[in-house]
């Protein structure tokens, strides 16, 4: 996971 709104797959919400 990352510090922003990205999931493990890298898709941004």
Curated annotation (Swiss-Prot):
The keyword Coiled coil does not apply. Glycans are attached at residues 4, 7, 9, 11. Keywords: Cell membrane, Glycoprotein, GPI-anchor, Lipoprotein, Membrane, Phosphoprotein. It is found in: Cell membrane. This peptide displays a high degree of glycan microheterogeneity resulting mainly from a variable number of mannose residues in each glycan. Both N-linked and O-linked glycans are high mannose. It is a lipid-anchor; GPI-anchor. One of its GO terms (cellular component) is side of membrane. This is GPI-anchored glycoprotein NETNES. It comes from Trypanosoma cruzi. The lineage of its organism: Eukaryota, Discoba, Euglenozoa, Kinetoplastea, Metakinetoplastina.
